[in-house]
Amino acid sequence: MNTEATHDQNEAQSTGVRLRNAREQLGLSQQAVAERLCLKVSTVRDIEEDKAPADLASTFLRGYIRSYARLVHIPEEELLPGLEKQAPVRPSKVAPMQSFSLGKRRKKRDGWLMTFTWLVLFVVVGLTGAWWWQNHKAQQEELTTMVDQSSAELNAGGDSAQSVPLDTSEAASQDSTPAPTAPVDSTATNAVPQTPDASATTTAPAADAQQNAVVAPSQANVDTATTAPAATGDTASLPTDQAGVATSAVDQNALVMNFTADCWLEVTDATGKKLFSGMQRKDGNLNLTGQAPYKLKIGAPAAVQIQYQGKPVDLSRFIRTNQVARLTLNAEQSPAQ
C-alpha cells in the first residue's frame, strides 16, 4: 500500500519538483548541480520550475533533464511521461534547400562580368595602340613630305647654281685681266667659308679687284709698268681685309651642327631664306651663317649636336618625346618652340 501511494504521489509531481526534492535530499545546491552538469545556474532553475527556455532546443533540454536525473539517482523511465509534457519534441524548422540554379545564375553573372571587363581592357589597349600608330604614321608622313620638298628645292637650287659658272666664264673670256689678278681671286675665294652669305660677300670685292686691275694698265704708261704689280698688290689686299671683316661679322651668328646619325634638317634665317634643307649623313658637319633669329626643323633631334654663338643648344625635351624638333634661336641663344 505504501509503495503504491508513493508511486501515485511521484506521478502527481512534475519532473522539476521531483528533481528538486531529490537534490535537497542529497544536500546539493543548485550551484553544485550546475557545476557538475556544466550548466548555468539559470538553466538548472528553469528545469526545476518546469520552464522550457525559448532559446534552448527541446533535444538539449531533454538531455539536461536526463543528466540531472542520473545525478540525483532518479530512474529515467519514471521521468519519461513528464518529459513528453515538459519538453515535447518539436520539429525543427528546416530551411528549404536552395536549388543549384541560384549558384548557376550567380556563376553565369560573374562570367558575364569578367567577359565585359576583358572586353573593356581590350578596347582600351586597342585604342591606345591605334592612337600611337596614327601619331607615328603622321610623323613619318611629315618627314617624307619634308624630304620631298627639300629634294625639290635642292634640284631647283642646283639648276640656278649651275648658271653662275657659265656667266663668270663668259665674263672672264670677255675681260682682258692681267695674269697677277688670277691668284688674288683664287686666294680670296678659298679664304671665305662655303656659305651663301659669305660667298656673296666675297664675290663683290673680287669683282672690284678685277675692275681695278683692268683700269690700272690702261692708265699707266709703259715706263711705269714696274709699279703695276705694286698697285695690283694693294688692290688685292683690300678684298682680303674686307673678307676678314665679313668673316668676323658672320661668326657672331655662326650656327655649327655635328651629326651622329642620318638626319633631315631645315634652317631658315630671319629674312625667310633657307640656309639649308635636306639630309645630313652620319659624322657630317654643317656651318651656317645668316641673319638671326634662325628657325630650325630637325627630324631626329637625338642625331644632331648644335652650337650657337659658341654655346651648346639643349634639345633634351625633343629627344624625350621623340618628335620632330621645331625651335627658334634668337640673338640671345634662347631656343623657343
From Swiss-Prot:
Periplasmic side: 133-337
Biased composition (Polar residues): 160-192
Residue ranges of the region described as Disordered: 155-220
Cytoplasmic side: 1-111
InterPro entries, sorted: Bact_Cytoskel_RodZ (IPR050400), Cro/C1-type_HTH (IPR001387), Lambda_DNA-bd_dom_sf (IPR010982), RodZ (IPR023690), RodZ-like_C (IPR025194)
GO BP term (any one): regulation of cell shape
SUPFAM superfamilies membership: lambda repressor-like DNA-binding domains
Alphabetical UniProt keywords: Cell inner membrane, Cell membrane, Cell shape, DNA-binding, Membrane, Signal-anchor, Transmembrane, Transmembrane helix
Biased composition (Low complexity): 193-217
Any single Gene Ontology cellular-component annotation: plasma membrane
GO MF annotations, alphabetized: DNA binding
Ribosomal protein in keyword set: no
Membrane-crossing residue ranges in chain numbering: 112-132
Location, primary (coarse class): membrane
Membrane topology note: Single-pass type II membrane protein
DNA-binding residues: 30-49
Function as written in the Swiss-Prot or TrEMBL entry: Cytoskeletal protein that is involved in cell-shape control through regulation of the length of the long axis.
Domain notes: The helix-turn-helix (HTH) motif in the cytoplasmic domain of the N-terminus is involved in the formation of spirals to maintain the rigid rod shape. As this protein is anchored in the cytoplasmic membrane, the HTH motif may contribute to protein-protein interactions to form the RodZ helix, which is localized beneath the cytoplasmic membrane. The C-terminal domain may be critical for determination of the rod shape by probably interacting with enzymes required for synthesis of the peptidoglycan layer, including PBPs in the periplasm.
PANTHER family in alphabetical order: CYTOSKELETON PROTEIN RODZ, PTHR34475
Family: Belongs to the RodZ family.
Name listed for the protein in its UniProt record: Cytoskeleton protein RodZ
Species this chain originates from: Citrobacter koseri (strain ATCC BAA-895 / CDC 4225-83 / SGSC4696)
Gene: rodZ
